[in-house]
From Swiss-Prot:
It holds the Pfam family NAD_binding_10. Belongs to the avfA family. Coiled coil: none annotated. Reductase; part of the gene cluster that mediates the biosynthesis of pyranterreones, a family of antioxidative compounds. The first step of pyranonigrins biosynthesis is performed by the hybrid PKS-NRPS synthetase pytA that condenses 4 malonyl-CoA units ato the acetyl starter unit by the modular PKS of pytA. The acyl chain is then connected to an L-serine through the amide bond by the modular NRPS of pytA. A tetramic acid is formed and released from the PKS-NRPS pytA to give pyranterreone 5 with the help of the thioesterase pytI. Keywords: Oxidoreductase. This is Reductase pytE. Its EC number is 1.-.-.-. It is an enzyme of class 1 (oxidoreductase). SUPFAM superfamilies: NAD(P)-binding Rossmann-fold domains.
Amino acid sequence: MSSSKPTIAFFGATGGSTISCLAPALKAGYRCAALARTPSRLRDLLVQRGVSESTIADNLTIVSGTATDLQPVKQTLQMGRPASDMADLIVSGIGGKLIMSNPLSPTLDNPTICQDVVRNILTAIRELRDTGTTKAPFLITLSTTGISEVKRDLPIAMMPMYHWMLKVPHDDKKVMERLIVDDAERDPAARALGGYVIVRPSLLTDGDRDKGGDLKKIRVGVEEAPAVGYTISREDVGRWVFEHLVKKGRESEYAGKAVTITY
């Protein structure tokens, strides 16, 4: 593996979009760490995506735990090695499970999961910085369309469903995004992050990963001029993040922006 490749810490790695970024990163030789509640499940999912056992052993450190706990977040940022420096990049695709027991008021199993995890990531970086590291990781986080306060980024026909069924997760994502932007607006010396990209995919679907679709079909916009569409597959979200954000890192044209992606 080339030493020039950045190290990457993954949160929410068993989720469809995140693992679809982790798998190609491992195959390409990036050294990665991933936090997983059930490490064996993550390994199985990676093998299903064609990642060899030897590649997993060589390039991936799995930290057992949950991202709502600060200590395993720290361990993941340190690539699973207490004496090592922090990861260069962070990819976070944390999300909650939608609960429909009350159809009039859908919620999440943890209504503040996204903001809690990003808050933990920022806290962990600052605490690790106190131990002597000067590194400021670059954060790539998965959010959603339907929450922009600048311009409408979803079809009008989908607005009623989004504002009813997804109100709770959207409120959570808004706070998550605000935490990231607030950090970027601090004085440079006080920032936890060395930059960010917020990815806002349209409604996520379970596409066929074996077909390896052409990423050129994905339309891309920014908050001021969003790409408006109905759906995009989790698989293509992860692949797009790897090709256009992980590979370019801090040099990405989307650094410091909220990016919409859709078909």
